[in-house]
């Protein structure tokens, strides 16, 4: 039945036990609209069809007034229980409900008689009934509706069992069913088990064993003819939801006379479990041979049952033969049938029109209500499909599991019904737990029914054989796989070759830096240094317009360009030469007066790796905080006194810049040092300036102590730094090498004492000595022009003692020491070996890196200075001419063409080292289109003379960490001279490069506007107009257009006319049509593509 109170044709046919065709014919006679077996009809129409088919016959149902009398030997007897009649909406019934009902035994009622409640009789100790068949009366009795399933909340009270009333009507040759109550059991009705899938409530008696209460009699069983089953208002099954509101259908029932005679031996039943929980829809466990007797009434069949041909069998189908082994005997387990003769079959039914197959239950579950102790299991017929989803009751293969026994084994419709009844979500087979009483099941499955069921189960589980076509084509995928395997073999060879090539490239790690000796290399030598193939170098040169072979020599600019393309910086050999110690400070006469001197330690490393912060931690000062941009841009000299082996020892530290522009400074620092401290950040590793510092230290042949800084920072990895340094042949002591590596933290001050101790140990091995009793010799570390003090130089005394008033010569500069101060700004009278001081009294700013020497008198000093000044002047002129890199012919040609651009600069810086660093960086800027002319470069402040020179030559004054003298700013404002001051070298170089680019003429570039497609051509007089559709962008009037026809450009010029709907417009956007016309082109064709663009100016960039 559908959820809206309607019945489908196929459900009605199953209820009536007829074919769908018979029901459709009956509906057609009654003018009821029903097209097919799945059509739905109302309950009233279903009642009309039932009445017609009941009167008409077909052997389905006897008429209500005159029931058909079956022929002798043709009737099938069935013991039927009285169903508890409390659905969710109970239908009117004859019986009176009781507040707490018990499960009723089937009673034999006279159709016209009313059913009265009666106490349940005591169940007998053990018996199998012998039924006595009585002829049914023509009167009708209304059957109660099938009970509904319980909800999870509370059970619904059920009616009391009906009082049996036996009416005898003798019939010759028919057996009698004799029943005698024996004992009364006292089980407690269990709590109904909720079922989530079925919300409709079911009385507690449904699915529960018959447990009569004391003081109540047990009803007697009744015999109902299978040909006339009782029909409730709505066809329901045991455990299915009740359909409220459906009218009940009266059904004539035969009566029982007498009491049942015990036939089976005692001990064949299974004792009823008391209080066990029942599962709704679980089958009743029947008695088994060899088991203790089951309490309750038993029935005994006396005489031969009567069969009638064409009558409705237990399955509800007319004419269907009775299935052998159907569960019709008490004591037989559900699903296990004893093979008997076909004529001796007896079907036990419930008093419902559509009996349903109960689902299998657990072995320990009690019997269902209405199937009292010792009563026969009702026949299992195929239920109609309910509207709500239900639990499938078909359990193949499980012990005690029931097949759908309403149809014979050879009927395939039984399997089809089983498949249809399963919903896709519930097709998983549920495991049935075998209890202790199921041991005898195996012995009962060997009969005809067991063999038939096993055969059906095996057939249902068997895998179908593969078609011959699939078996024939099975080898084809193997062949295809073999074919693909051959193809992948060639691909594997190519992949292996690529992997080998990649492995070779991985092994040939490109260096971080290369050093070029003598300013030239051959192509093969450059390829070996860069760890690339020589063909890659030749290809790179070819793209630069240079045809070269592997033996061709390349000059320095070409080498730098190629190396820069591969990402490797180039270090010239002369820079490394600057780090070599060329002058021996200790002479032969000093060896008799040598004493130990403090070591000079130079701190080197990459920019921002913490060199100055490490020195601050050693000196307990904050020099790094005062550095512009946080980076060191000049050399600082400091002296630290520490305690070692219970004596005070001194260390002189030189702090060098880490920026790439200060290569010469690092070389000078390395030249005068005794030990190089290489600072490497633990979170950054080895960087280009780190490698450069390593090369400087090796060129100066000084030992290296590695300080792995920033170990407190997240992501630091000292082991990774050691690994990278090992690739540069710096192997740590704990790795089996000879290089001291100390992890430190400059911020937190970790391991600073250990680093100092290691420095002293290394310098003790070097045995550093000097003669303090001679005239001083040393090196100019740094020099600058102080506006108050004049030229100031930082001097490192390497041998002898420098005193106030000494006359010295520093390169071409003559000086007389007027005063000396140390790093703490304390004035000194003298400075011994390895002492760094700032000295005043030079005639001009000396050049950083020059050696100084003290002479006994001023005359000898001036003679030496004069010779050096002449040499320095010649060298300076040569450098200025070389910086031009432009011949007179080239200059005149560029001037005539208007391509010669010059940028004049006047450079003033704080110290000499900064001047040479800036000049070195300017040399590396591209000079093909703009020349940089440095008219003046010197340390010191910007003076009024500098402003006058800049005004006369049109130069820009660039100051670096310096200030302006009095009157210079006023003069600059009056003459309009641009004065720039910087404190970070990055910003200075960027601004100079942008100024050079500003001198270049801007270039014109195309800017795309849109495209249009010519869809029509209109001739207007002698000219033609193209009807276009704008596909992308916009078309602007007076813009440039390019007409494409296929792959050729047929016209390029201005767009003179642009119209839309005969109106002149300035622009047409995407998706609109327009007319395009040009004065110089009229040869338009359909399909032409118009490209619109405009010319815009763009700032040019410097190119190398």
UniProtKB/Swiss-Prot annotation:
Segments of this protein annotated with the region Disordered: 51-444, 461-497
Residue span of region G4: 709-712
Binding site residues for GTP: 605-612, 655-659, 709-712
Ranges for region G1: 605-612
Keyword terms: Cytoplasm, GTP-binding, Initiation factor, Nucleotide-binding, Protein biosynthesis
Matches recorded under InterPro entries: EF-G-like_DII, IF2_II, IF2_N, P-loop_NTPase, Small_GTP-bd, T_Tr_GTP-bd_dom, TF_IF2_bacterial-like, TIF_IF2
Region (G3): 655-658
Localization of this protein: Cytoplasm
Family annotation (Pfam families): EF-G_D2, GTP_EFTU, IF-2, IF2_N
Entry-linked SMART domains: RAS
Sequence ranges of Basic and acidic residues compositional bias: 406-420
Gene Ontology molecular function: any one: translation initiation factor activity
GO CC terms, sorted: cytosol
Bias (Pro residues) ranges: 189-202
Function, in words: One of the essential components for the initiation of protein synthesis. Protects formylmethionyl-tRNA from spontaneous hydrolysis and promotes its binding to the 30S ribosomal subunits. Also involved in the hydrolysis of GTP during the formation of the 70S ribosomal complex.
Family: Belongs to the TRAFAC class translation factor GTPase superfamily. Classic translation factor GTPase family. IF-2 subfamily.
NCBIfam families according to UniProt: IF-2, small_GTP
Name of the molecule in the record: Translation initiation factor IF-2
Gene field: infB
């Amino acid at each position: 039945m559908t959820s809206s109170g309607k019945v489908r044709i196929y459900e009605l046919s199953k209820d009536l036990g007829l074919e769908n065709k018979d029901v459709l014919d009956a509906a057609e006679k009654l003018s009821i609209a029903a097209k097919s077996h799945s059509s739905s009809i109302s309950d009233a129409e279903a009642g009309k069809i039932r009445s017609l088919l009941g009167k008409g016959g077909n052997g389905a149902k006897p008429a209500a007034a005159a029931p058909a009398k079956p022929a002798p030997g043709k009737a099938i007897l069935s013991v039927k229980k009285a169903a508890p009649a409390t659905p969710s909406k109970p239908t009117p019934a004859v019986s009176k409900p009781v507040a707490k009902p018990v499960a009723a035994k089937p009673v034999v009622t006279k159709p016209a008689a009313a059913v009265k409640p009666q106490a349940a009789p005591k169940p007998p100790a053990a018996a199998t009934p012998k039924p006595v068949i009585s002829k049914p009366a023509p009167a009708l009795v209304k059957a109660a509706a099938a009970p509904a399933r319980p909800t999870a909340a509370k059970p619904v009270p059920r009616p009391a069992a009906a009082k049996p009333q036996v009416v005898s009507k003798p019939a010759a040759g028919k057996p009698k069913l004799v029943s005698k109550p024996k004992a009364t059991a006292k089980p407690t009705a269990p709590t109904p088990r909720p079922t989530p899938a079925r919300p409709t409530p079911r009385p507690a008696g449904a699915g529960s064993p018959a447990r009569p209460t004391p003081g109540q009699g047990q009803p007697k069983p009744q015999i109902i003819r299978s040909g006339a089953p009782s029909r409730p208002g709505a066809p329901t099954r045991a455990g299915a939801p009740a359909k409220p509101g459906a009218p009940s259908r009266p059904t004539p029932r035969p009566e029982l006379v007498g009491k049942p005679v015990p036939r089976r031996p005692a001990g064949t039943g299974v004792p009823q479990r008391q209080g066990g929980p029942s599962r709704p829809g679980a089958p009743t466990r029947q008695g088994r041979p060899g088991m203790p007797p089951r309490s309750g009434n038993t029935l005994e069949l006396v005489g031969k049952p009567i069969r009638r041909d064409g009558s409705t069998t237990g399955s509800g189908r007319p004419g269907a033969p009775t299935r052998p082994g159907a569960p019709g005997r008490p004591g037989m387990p559900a699903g296990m049938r004893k093979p008997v003769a076909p004529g001796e079959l007896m079907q036990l039914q419930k008093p419902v029109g559509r009996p349903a197959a109960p689902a299998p239950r657990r072995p320990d579950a009690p019997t269902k209500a209405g199937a009292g102790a010792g009563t026969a299991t009702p026949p299992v017929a195929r239920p109609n499909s309910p509207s709500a989803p239900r639990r499938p009751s078909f359990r193949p293969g499980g012990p005690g599991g029931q097949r759908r026994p309403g149809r014979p084994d050879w009927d395939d419709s039984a399997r089809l019904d089983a498949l249809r009844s399963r919903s896709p979500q519930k097709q998983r087979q549920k495991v049935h737990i075998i209890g202790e009483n199921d041991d005898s099941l195996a012995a009962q499955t060997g009969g005809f029914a067991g063999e038939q069921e096993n055969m059906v189960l095996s057939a249902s589980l068997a895998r179908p054989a593969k078609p011959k076509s699939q078996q024939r084509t099975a080898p084809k995928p193997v062949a295809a796989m073999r074919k693909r395997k051959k193809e992948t073999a060639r691909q594997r060879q190519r992949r292996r070759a690529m992997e080998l090539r990649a492995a070779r490239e991985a092994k040939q790690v490109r260096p971080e830096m290369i050093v070029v000796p003598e300013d030239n290399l051959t192509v093969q030598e450059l390829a070996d240094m860069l760890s690339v193939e020589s063909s890659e170098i030749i290809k790179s040169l070819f793209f630069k317009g240079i045809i070269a072979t592997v033996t061709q020599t390349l000059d320095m600019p070409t080498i730098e360009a190629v190396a820069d393309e591969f990402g490797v910086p180039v270090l010239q050999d002369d820079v490394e030469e600057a780090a070599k110690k060329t002058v021996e400070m200790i002479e032969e006469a000093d060896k008799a007066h040598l004493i130990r001197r403090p070591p000079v330690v130079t701190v080197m490393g990459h920019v921002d790796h913490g060199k100055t912060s490490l020195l601050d931690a050693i000196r307990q000062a904050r020099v790094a905080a005062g550095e512009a941009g946080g980076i060191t841009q000049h050399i600082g000299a400091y002296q630290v006194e520490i305690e070692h082996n219970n004596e005070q020892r001194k260390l002189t530290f030189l702090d060098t810049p880490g920026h790439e522009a200060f290569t010469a400074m690092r070389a000078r620092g390395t030249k005068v040092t005794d030990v190089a401290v290489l600072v490497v950040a633990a979170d950054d590793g080895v960087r280009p300036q780190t490698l450069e510092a390593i090369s400087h230290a090796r060129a100066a042949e000084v030992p290296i102590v590695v300080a792995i800084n920033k170990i407190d920072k997240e992501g630091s990895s000292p082991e990774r730094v050691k690994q990278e340094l090992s690739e540069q042949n710096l192997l740590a002591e704990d790795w089996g090498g000879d290089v001291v590596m100390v992890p430190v933290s400059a911020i937190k001050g970790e391991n600073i004492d250990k680093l100092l101790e290691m420095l002293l140990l290394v310098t003790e091995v070097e045995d550093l000595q000097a003669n303090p009793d001679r005239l001083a010799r040393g090196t100019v570390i740094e020099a600058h022009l102080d506006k108050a003090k004049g030229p100031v130089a930082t001097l490192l005394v390497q041998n002898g003692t420098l005193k106030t008033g000494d006359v010295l010569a520093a390169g071409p500069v003559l000086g007389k020491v007027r005063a000396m101060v140390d790093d703490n700004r304390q004035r000194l009278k003298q400075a011994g070996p390895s002492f760094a001081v700032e000295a005043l009294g030079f005639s001009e700013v000396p050049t950083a890196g020059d050696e100084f020497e003290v002479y006994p008198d001023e005359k000898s000093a001036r003679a030496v200075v004069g010779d050096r000044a002449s040499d320095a002047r010649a060298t300076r002129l040569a450098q200025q001419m070389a910086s031009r890199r432009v011949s007179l012919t080239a200059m005149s040609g560029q001037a005539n063409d208007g391509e010669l651009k010059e940028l004049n600069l006047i450079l003033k810086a704080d110290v000499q080292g900064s001047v040479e660093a800036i000049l070195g960086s300017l040399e590396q800027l591209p000079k093909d289109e703009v020349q940089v002319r440095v008219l003046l470069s010197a340390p010191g402040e910007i003076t009024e003379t500098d402003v006058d020179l800049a005004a006369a030559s049109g130069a820009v004054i660039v100051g670096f960490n310096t200030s302006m003298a009095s009157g210079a700013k006023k003069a600059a404002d009056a003459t309009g001279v641009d004065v720039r001051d910087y404190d970070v070298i990055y910003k200075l170089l960027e601004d100079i490069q942008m100024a050079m680019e500003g001198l270049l003429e801007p270039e014109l570039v195309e800017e795309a506007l849109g495209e249009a497609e010519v869809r029509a051509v209109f001739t207007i007089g002698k000219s033609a107009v193209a009807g276009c559709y704008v596909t992308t962008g916009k078309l602007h009037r007076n813009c440039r257009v390019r007409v494409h026809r296929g792959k050729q450009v047929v016209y390029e010029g201005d767009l003179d006319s642009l119209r839309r709907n005969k109106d002149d417009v300035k622009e047409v956007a995407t998706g609109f049509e327009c007319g395009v016309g040009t004065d110089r082109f009229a040869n338009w064709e359909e399909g032409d593509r118009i490209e619109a663009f405009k010319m815009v100016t763009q700032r040019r960039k410097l190119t190398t």
